[in-house]
Swiss-Prot record:
Protein name per UniProt: Nitrogen permease regulator 3
Source lineage: Eukaryota, Fungi, Dikarya, Ascomycota, Pezizomycotina
One of the GO biological process terms: meiotic cell cycle
UniProt keyword Signal present: yes
Signal peptide from the UniProt entry: 1-23
Gene that encodes it: npr3
UniProt keyword list: Meiosis, Signal
Basic and acidic residues composition-biased segments: 230-245
Bias-annotated ranges (Basic residues): 43-55
Polar residues bias spans: 260-284
Length: 818
């Protein structure tokens, strides 16, 4: 995996709607009409697939014996289809697609993925189940939990799979009329497979009720995530939960793999192809069986909304989980609600099917049909909106009815702590910072591999990503219960004030502020940042997008016409790092220059240069601790031996008053001790075990001749704790004043107070991950006071040349980065 954190990449190829009634499944709608065209697969996706490993299986070999023509007319038609397929392969390179499906019965959500395919007209269709957990790669999917030991609703796919090549049209004809004479229209095939195959493949039987599973189709590697919910006779969704033994599930999955592959792929397949044709499932529930009602054949019993994905192989699990958690589950839940309330999905499915039948009779073109569908069907329009918005990493605002409106998105990545390496794809303009990463102070169990995230703690501030007037206008126009509170908070919020400070000044409770700020961050209207301060240092970001400098310069000039231009500001910030306050010419310009800084941060032009430190342990400290530990060992040993000798003397005195036999026995025992022939007794060497803890502090691998760094003071080992105790013990109790005549000056308290008082407060930040700039905000201390203490401890600053520093207090090693 690349070291750079990638922005959201939904890898969305298509969305499919399938419903099933008592009469059988029905392929209702899909968007885009032809995912293989330039409109469906963006150039970026083509470039991404082109960089992956191409499949070694050609389209000719995969389709040569599929249809098996039995007449001259069939043979001529078969040859024509092969020529069309070869032309299609020449126009677009073989594709690599992976993804994750999920179908939902009464409200289904599925994600389908594809990989290494030419999308030929003759691809076999296969399904298999594996007993493993959720796979991390496409084509070998293994969430495999199945209870379906019989083929059930999928068993009849065999009838259509064998003749699939006879029903398919060339993908390039999707913009034309209703297809060849006597054949199905072009909108009844998708990704090289006819609608009949998709209908039965993506409409699982009732045994799959509320289960999430993935489907792989041949070397297309299409995966479908499904969470079917079956509808009861009363119109409600079933919620029965059933759990079986894990071994039974694994065995059933293996049976299903074979049965499904044979059912959907009647032709011969190689072993590698069979492995690619996989389906993995995760059971979530089962609905009770129902008897069919003759008068109820047209009632919908299930629907699936299937998402076809195209993630890179190494990002398969992450991308599929993102779209499942953020899009599919929420979209399916809204459809379930409307279907249960008003029969929305079934009504819209019938409406869409009616429009398609009329278009088929009239020979309407695909483009005209889809324009009509999107205009007349709210469900088709909703699927269109979800696809176009999510595929572009935007927010999808969907209105199913006057009462049900939802907004869907995959939360964007707003920052990265890494610069791209030589082999990494660069994302210029992404905010370069570690400020929103989890640190040991935020979470003591965190480590450097913890993924970055927005930490909306009380010491953060809010940076609006658009003008305040624009956001307020949108908030007021949207209405809703949160609108008044949001508008009030936005007016009170400033990027120079933390949430806690805003709460104190505005009277808004801190939890409310954090909730509102989180809402604005999630919906891409703001960003959580450390509060802007004139004593902080800001530099030009190494990840800024200089290709947009001309456009940004014009926008900057409109926003700040009387202030230095954008090139001049960037040039000034590119020099020797210094506090931002040194760029402000006067107090009257303070607000304007902070507005400039906020504008630069918003566009990723600058980033904060922050300081990080760790405690250094010198050889002198190590040797002093070593000597002290050995002295303690000797003292304990001598003390224990003295106690043993005293006990022996007491026993000798008391033996003189015993009878002769006892005296003889005691004398014999003492003689035995003197001769060294001691009788083994429990606990005789107990004193040695008492020294075990002390000896454990003496790490033989620790060099006493080199300095060491304490990586995590909050998780220090016993030996590291002794080192830090020795360091603190050497701090002077009465430090000399920095300058003559400043004794008792409150402004010099950080220079005149013993560091022993400050050490417990500051030590937790000396871990190399928490910026020292946090201390003043988190501990509610004056910045000047904090930097005085840090300077005494060894932080390299520009003002330390004027101070008389004590070498005994110089214990920090510091670095500076973003």
């Amino acid at each position: 995996m690349s070291s750079i954190a990638r922005p959201p990449d939904p890898c969305l190829v298509a969305i499919i709607l399938i419903v099933r009634s008592r009469a059988g499944p029905r392929f209702v709608f899909h968007y885009p009409p032809n995912p293989l065209s330039d409109n469906g697969l963006k150039s970026a996706k083509k470039a991404r697939r082109a960089s992956r490993t191409k499949s070694t299986r050609s389209s000719d070999s995969s389709s040569s014996d599929d249809s098996g023509p039995t007449s001259d007319e069939d043979e001529e038609e078969h040859q024509r289809l092969q020529q069309q397929q070869q032309q299609q392969q020449a126009q677009q390179q073989s594709s690599h697609i992976a993804g994750q499906p999920l179908s939902v019965t009464h409200l289904a959500g599925s994600a389908v993925s594809r990989r290494s395919s030419n999308f030929g007209l003759d691809d076999h269709v296969g399904m298999a189940a594996s007993p493993g957990g959720e796979s991390a790669r496409a084509g070998s999917i293994g969430s495999g939990r199945t209870l379906l030991r019989k083929r059930g609703g999928n068993s009849d796919v065999e009838d259509d799979a064998g003749t699939s090549s006879d029903r398919q049209d060339d993908a390039g004809s999707s913009a034309m009329g209703g297809g060849r004479k006597g054949g199905p229209p072009p909108w009844e095939s998708l990704l090289g497979l006819p609608a009949k195959v998709w209908e039965k493949l993506l409409s699982p039987s009732r045994a799959w009720h509320k289960r999430r599973f993935e489907v792989g189709i041949n070397d297309l590697g299409r995966k479908k995530k499904k969470k079917p919910r079956a509808e009861r006779q009363g119109g409600e969704l079933g919620h029965n939960e059933h759990t079986d033994d894990a071994r039974e599930e694994a065995d059933a999955g293996e049976e299903l793999m074979v049965a499904s592959t044979e059912t959907l792929s009647p032709h011969q397949m190689s072993a590698s192809e069979s492995q690619r044709a996989s389906i993995a499932s995760s059971k979530t529930g089962r609905a009770p069986s129902e008897s069919l009602d003759v008068d109820d054949k047209d009632r919908m019993t299930m629907f699936n909304v299937v998402f076809v994905l195209d993630p890179p192989l190494l990002e398969y699990s992450m991308r599929s989980r993102e779209i499942y958690d953020n899009i599919i589950k929420k979209f399916a839940k809204a459809l379930k609600w409307e279907q249960a309330r008003t029969g929305y999905v079934w009504r819209e499915a019938q409406h869409i099917s009616h429009i398609k039948e009329k278009a088929k009779e009239k020979g309407t073109s695909v483009n005209a049909l889809y324009t009509e569908l999107i205009n007349q069907s709210s469900l088709a329009r909703a699927i269109y909106t979800v696809y176009t918005s999510i595929a572009a990493s935007k927010i999808a605002s969907v209105s199913l009815s006057p009462d049900v409106s939802i907004s869907l998105q995959i939360p964007p990545l707003t920052s990265t702590p890494y610069l791209p390496g030589p082999t990494d794809e660069a994302y210029p303009g992404l905010w370069l910072t570690t400020a929103d990463s989890v640190t040991p102070v935020d979470d003591p169990t965190a480590n450097e591999s913890t993924a970055p995230h927005q930490v909306l703690a009380k010491h953060f501030a809010l940076l609006l990503l658009d003008s305040e007037a624009t956001i307020l206008k949108d908030v007021e126009a949207s209405g809703g219960a949160l609108a008044p509170a949001l508008a009030h908070y936005i007016r009170c919020s400033k990027p120079t004030k933390s949430f806690a400070q805003i709460s104190a000044s505005s009277g808004i409770p801190l939890p409310t502020i954090q909730m509102l700020a989180s809402h604005l961050v999630y919906w891409r209207r703001a960003r959580a940042i450390p509060p802007l301060h004139q004593r902080d240092t800001y530099i030009v970001s190494p990840n800024c997008d200089l290709s947009k400098l001309d456009v940004a310069t014009a926008a900057y000039q409109l926003a700040f016409p009387t202030l230095p231009s954008l090139p001049k500001m960037l040039s000034a910030l590119s020099g020797t790092p210094r506090p931002y306050g040194s760029f402000i010419p006067s107090k009257d310009h303070k607000d304007a220059y902070f507005a400039i800084l906020a504008w630069l941060l918003r566009g990723g032009w600058v980033t904060q240069l922050r300081s990080f430190s760790r405690v250094k342990v010198t050889p002198e400290i190590k040797m002093a601790v070593e000597v002290a530990l050995r002295r303690e060992e000797v003292d304990k040993y001598l003390s224990k031996r003295g106690n043993v000798s005293s006990d022996a003397g007491n026993r000798g005195d008391s033996s003189e008053h015993d009878d002769d036999d006892a005296s003889s026995s005691s004398s014999s025992s003492l003689a035995s001790q003197d001769s060294g022939e001691e009788t083994p007794m429990p606990g005789r060497y107990k004193q040695d075990s008492e020294l075990q803890l002390t000896r454990s502090l003496l790490d033989r691998n620790t060099s006493l001749k080199t300095s060491s760094l304490i990586l995590f003071p909050h998780r220090a080992s016993p030996l590291e704790s002794r080192w830090m105790d020795e360091i603190v013990s050497r701090f002077p109790d009465n430090p000399r004043p920095a300058r003559p005549g400043t004794e008792g000056d409150p402004e010099q308290a950080g220079l005149q107070t013993s560091l022993k008082q400050f050490w417990p407060t500051y030590i937790k930040y000396f871990n190399g991950y928490d910026a020292l700039e946090k201390i003043s905000v988190r501990e509610n201390l004056k910045r000047k006071h904090v930097w005085q203490v840090l300077t005494r401890l060894g932080l390299v600053t520009g003002s330390q040349a004027s101070l008389d520093l004590d070498p005994r207090e110089q214990v920090l090693v510091s670095v500076r980065h973003w």
